[in-house]
Amino acid sequence: MTASQAKKELMRRALEIDPTVHVGKDGVDENLNNEVVQQLKKRRLIKVTVLNNAEADTKTVAEDIAAATGSVIVDVRGGVIILTDKRTWDSQCQKKSDN
């Protein structure tokens, strides 16, 4: 499976989940990163919402969280970030197509 197919599959799965982490005016800090790591261990695919009062833009927040937690950015749209853990991303990319 190519990276684009893996991304498509993970985005399809993300439609069924609600955001579990919210980034507010405090931005990305150690507590937020710890929460993201815990959520990824439990769920392997999470949505993060960046609220309007956050000082940084969504793309910057996504890059900061991914760098601090070792996660992979699946998609960034509007104020929503979809993240997955590295292991899930690698396993999705290595799956064979059912063709």
What spans do the regions from the language model cover?
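Positively charged, polar, low-complexity stretches
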Residues: M1-N99
